[in-house]
């Protein structure tokens, strides 16, 4: 559980600040010109960024979670394997949601603004959700909570699965938005 708290704050901070300029920085420094003159679709361009960042984030998170699992078993006792993988799988969907927010904001805004909006969406909405979240149980921002519930029992199945569905729909919506913004902002590329 302590590892989750660290991932939720420092991990999200690293993800957002590390990748907020993924697309916007290429527009600003002129590298985007080399890409936009090629016959490549904006969907391919956006998804290539999303896949690479998602892979880096998921591999990093899984290495950290597997290490934590190993040391927890050594020091404190057995953690059920099925519960651990349900926890890690749920948390992976949350990580992909965060990555999608960051890349979509980078396609839309300059680097500083993309980082700010991404941090507000990821961290501030989580704080609001923790304060007022008792009034709604289906939200992408609930996934980290549902992930930890796999280790302490199991989350309410209906709310959990609806949150997964809503998150996947939000990911698709953010990808569509990011592709559209990549196309719209291509003309802002410096030469």
State the predicted function of each range.
Residues 1-2, 115-191:
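Terminal transmembrane helical anchor/hairpin motif
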Residues 25, 29, 72, 76, ...:
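Perimembrane helix-loop junctions in membrane proteins
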Residues 40, 111-112, 172:
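Conformational gate/switch positions in structured elements
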């Amino acid at each position: 559980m302590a590892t989750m708290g660290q991932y939720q704050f420092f991990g999200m901070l690293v993800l957002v600040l590390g990748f907020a300029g993924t697309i916007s920085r290429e527009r600003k420094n002129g590298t985007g010109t080399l890409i936009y003159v090629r016959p490549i679709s904006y969907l391919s361009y956006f998804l290539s960024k999303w896949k690479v960042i998602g892979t880096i984030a998921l591999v990093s998170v899984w290495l950290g979670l597997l290490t934590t699992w190993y040391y927890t078993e050594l020091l404190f006792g057995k953690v059920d394997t099925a519960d651990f993988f349900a926890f890690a799988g749920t948390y992976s969907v949350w990580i992909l949601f965060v990555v999608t927010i960051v890349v979509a904001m980078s396609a839309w805004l300059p680097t500083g603004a993309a980082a700010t909006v991404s941090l507000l969406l990821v961290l501030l909405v989580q704080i609001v959700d923790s304060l007022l979240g008792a009034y709604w149980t289906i939200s992408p921002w609930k996934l980290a909570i549902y992930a930890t519930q796999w280790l302490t029992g199991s989350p309410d199945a209906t709310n959990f699965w609806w949150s997964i569905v809503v998150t996947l729909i939000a990911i698709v919506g953010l990808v569509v938005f990011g592709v559209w913004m990549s196309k719209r902002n291509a003309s802002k590329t410096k030469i």
